[in-house]
Every structure is written in structure tokens, then in C-alpha cells.
Amino acid sequence: MDRRSRAQQWRRARHNYNDLCPPIGRRAATALLWLSCSIALLRALASSNARAQQRAAQRRSFLNAHHRSAAAAAAAQVLPESSESESDHEHEEVEPELARPECLEYDQDDYETETDSETEPESDIESETEIETEPETEPETAPTTEPETEPEDERGPRGATFNQSLTQRLHALKLQSADASPRRAQPTTQEPESASEGEEPQRGPLDQDPRDPEEEPEERKEENRQPRRCKTRRPARRRDQSPESPPRKGPIPIRRH
């Protein structure tokens, strides 16, 4: 009975449920639930995407601003250096223009006199260098005279007198060198070589000893008569190269036990 009553109760409950919520209504309710949940999820995803995009845009704007500020600072540092370098170049360009003196206009006669006066000291310097080189080539016996140098600023009649004195000194130095050359040339005497190898060179009277002038020629004659004797060569002793060979003193004694 209990089982039947329970089955009846379940059937009644189902019928009551179906009456209250028919199957069509139940399916519609489930579909609405799914739709509402999906819509809520989509909205959440959309909001999260929007927030992520906003954050990315903020980061980009911040980075761009930072890079722009760094570039502006670098440009600001480069610009003053370039401006300073340009100002330095301008100063350098201005300085040579200021340093150039204004050339005054002279006549041609003034230029000619200046060139003539410049050529005179050059000729004096050349003559002085010639005089200085000649005494170095002369021998030590000849007295060397150093030319007196005069300042280049003194010009006029003194130059002619100086040239005359230089020519006189040159002439005197040439004469002294001509006198010294024959003194240096001395006759060189060469000793006559012996004609034959066997003959001994004859000694002069100066080589002889004054103590015994009579004994020397006799000794020389005896030496010439006696033939030269060669020294006898002693036979070299041979040694045994083998270290094991016994000495040649006598027979080796044999011991018998």
C-alpha cells in the first residue's frame, strides 16, 4: 500500500506541476535564462576590452610624451652648442679681417730702392760665408784670420770699404796657402826591395855597431858558409785509444787458488 500511495502522490504532483508550469513555459524560461547569462557575459567582456584599450592608449600617450620631451631636451642641448660653434666661427672669420693692415700706396721709386737695399746685405753675407769656408780648408800651420762682421743696418759708403778690405784679405789668404803648399810636399823615399829571396838585405853604415866593426863581417861570412840546419822532428808517442787495454809494463800475473 505504501508503494501505491507513493506512486499516486508523484503522479498528482507531476500533474499539478504541469498544470502550474506547462512544458512550453518551462522551455521558454530556460531559454531566457541562457540568453540573459550570455548577454551579461558579453557585456563584461566588452567592458574589459574597453578598459584594456583605454590603458593601452594612456601608456602610448605617456611614452610618446616622454620621448618627445627627451628629444626636445637633446635638441635644446645641441642647439646651444651649434650656436656657440657658429659664433666661434664668426669670431674667427672676423679676426683675420681685423688683423689685415691697410696697405698704403707707395710709388714705384720707393719699391726699387727697397729691393736694391735688400740685395746689398745678401751679397755681403755670401762673401762672408766664402771667407769662413776657405780658412777651414787651409792647413793648421797657416794663421786663420776671422773676418770682422759688421751690422747689416749700416749701409752706404762703408759697404764699399768693407768690400775692398775683403778682397785684400782674400788675396793675402791665397798667397799664404800657396806658400804653405810647397812646405807640405816632402820627398818620399822608398826603400829598395831585395832582388832575390835568398839574399839578405845589406845593412848600411849606420846599422853597424861602432863597438866591434871588424868582428861583424867575419861572423856574417861564417854564417853564409855554413848551411842552415833543420831541427830534427821527434817521433810522437802513440797511445792506445782503447781504454780497456792494459798498460805495457809486463805480463799480467795469474793467481791460482
From Swiss-Prot:
Q: What Gene Ontology terms describe what this protein does at the molecular function level?
A: adenylate cyclase activator activity; adenylate cyclase regulator activity; alkylglycerophosphoethanolamine phosphodiesterase activity; G protein activity; GTPase activity
Where do Basic residues bias regions lie? 227-237
User: Please, which domain of life does this record's source organism belong to?
Assistant: Eukaryota
Which terms under GO biological process does the entry name? adenylate cyclase-activating dopamine receptor signaling pathway; adenylate cyclase-activating G protein-coupled receptor signaling pathway; cartilage development; cellular response to glucagon stimulus; embryonic cranial skeleton morphogenesis; embryonic hindlimb morphogenesis; endochondral ossification; energy reserve metabolic process
- Which spans does this entry mark as compositional bias, Acidic residues? 104-139
One Pfam family of this chain: NESP55
Where in the sequence is the signal peptide annotated? 1-46
Q: What does the UniProt entry say about where the protein is found? A: Cytoplasmic vesicle, Secretory vesicle; Secreted
Q: Which GO terms describe its cellular component?
A: dendrite; extracellular region; heterotrimeric G-protein complex; membrane; plasma membrane; transport vesicle
PTM summary: Binds keratan sulfate chains.
> Compositional bias of type Basic and acidic residues: which residue ranges?
86-103, 200-211
Please name every pair of cysteines joined by a disulfide bond in this record. Answer: none
Q: Which UniProt keywords apply?
A: Cleavage on pair of basic residues, Cytoplasmic vesicle, Glycoprotein, Proteoglycan, Secreted, Signal
Which residue ranges are recorded for the region named Disordered?
A: 61-257
Additional comment: This protein is produced by a bicistronic gene which also produces the ALEX protein from an overlapping reading frame. The GNAS locus is imprinted in a complex manner, giving rise to distinct paternally, maternally and biallelically expressed proteins. The XLas isoforms are paternally derived, the Gnas isoforms are biallelically derived and the Nesp55 isoforms are maternally derived.
Write down what this protein is called: Neuroendocrine secretory protein 55
Gene source species: Mus musculus
- Gene name as annotated: Gnas
